Swiss-Prot record:
<keyword id="KW-0051">Antiviral defense</keyword>
<comment type="function">
    <text>CRISPR (clustered regularly interspaced short palindromic repeat) is an adaptive immune system that provides protection against mobile genetic elements (viruses, transposable elements and conjugative plasmids). CRISPR clusters contain sequences complementary to antecedent mobile elements and target invading nucleic acids. CRISPR clusters are transcribed and processed into CRISPR RNA (crRNA). Processes pre-crRNA into individual crRNA units.</text>
</comment>
<dbReference type="InterPro" id="IPR013396">
    <property type="entry name" value="CRISPR-assoc_prot_Csy4"/>
</dbReference>
<dbReference type="GO" id="GO:0043571">
    <property type="term" value="P:maintenance of CRISPR repeat elements"/>
</dbReference>
<dbReference type="GO" id="GO:0003723">
    <property type="term" value="F:RNA binding"/>
</dbReference>
<dbReference type="InterPro" id="IPR042564">
    <property type="entry name" value="CRISPR-Cas6/Csy4_sf"/>
</dbReference>
<keyword id="KW-0255">Endonuclease</keyword>
<keyword id="KW-0694">RNA-binding</keyword>
<keyword id="KW-0540">Nuclease</keyword>
<keyword id="KW-0378">Hydrolase</keyword>
<protein>
    <recommendedName>
        <fullName>CRISPR-associated endonuclease Cas6/Csy4</fullName>
        <ecNumber>3.1.-.-</ecNumber>
    </recommendedName>
</protein>
<dbReference type="GO" id="GO:0051607">
    <property type="term" value="P:defense response to virus"/>
</dbReference>
<comment type="function">
    <text>Complements a csy4 disruption in Pseudomonas aeruginosa PA14, restoring inhibition of biofilm formation and generation of crRNA.</text>
</comment>
<dbReference type="Pfam" id="PF09618">
    <property type="entry name" value="Cas_Csy4"/>
</dbReference>
<comment type="similarity">
    <text>Belongs to the CRISPR-associated endoribonuclease Cas6 family. Cas6f/Csy4, subtype I-F/Ypest subfamily.</text>
</comment>
<dbReference type="GO" id="GO:0004519">
    <property type="term" value="F:endonuclease activity"/>
</dbReference>
Length: 184
């Protein structure tokens, strides 16, 4: 995690920055999944209500250069500006950037559990009475599942600043429940 590169989504009259960031992130997800290394993490330096127009990729110089050699942004190069792979500047701290899955529709989840054979209909009805819908105000990207083609919101949490880094692997989204990225 000693290098990074930054991609900025450029303003466009036809496409919102959220739409372009989601398209960029979907391409990143595909290439990170194909690499299967778990050595590149992401952060959104402008995160607020939405992730913002900047995406940072964190990793070793070798990992980031290998990623860039794959020309994974093909088709989006006119819509974004990318920095070269650069050493990390002075670090303010370390941060976990993770995915949060919100169970927003208990009825749908219980129907799925019955269909899969995990619960009987009676058990599902009992549980439905006790389960409440979950909501979150975390920033998100609108994504499309590659396997089912269903649309979903990928909620992203930037954890508190930590004093020490935590090693670990990153998912094909560049997110981790435990591993940290440098925050600067």
């Amino acid at each position: 995690m000693d290098h990074y590169l930054e991609i900025r989504v450029l303003p466009d009259p036809e496409f919102s920055s959220e739409m372009l960031m989601a398209a960029l992130f979907a391409k990143l997800h595909r290439v990170l999944g194909a690499r299967g290394q778990g050595d590149i993490g992401v952060s959104f330096p402008d995160v607020n209500v939405m992730p913002g127009a900047r995406l940072r990729l964190h990793g070793s110089a070798q990992a980031l250069q290998a990623l860039e050699a794959s020309t994974w942004r093909k088709g989006l190069t006119d819509y974004c500006q990318c920095s070269p792979v650069t050493p990390v500047p002075e670090i303010k701290g370390w941060r976990v950037v993770s995915r949060v899955q919100v169970k927003s529709n208990p009825q749908r989840l219980l129907r799925r559990s019955v269909k899969k054979g995990w619960l009987t209909e009676e058990q599902a009805i009992e549980r439905l009475a006790t389960q409440a819908e979950q909501r979150t105000d975390l920033p998100f990207l609108n994504m499309k599942s590659l396997s089912s083609q269903q649309l979903f919101k990928l909620f992203i949490r930037h954890g508190d600043l930590l004093k020490e880094p935590v090693k670990g692997e990153f998912s094909s989204y560049g997110l981790s429940a435990t591993a940290t990225i440098p925050w600067f």
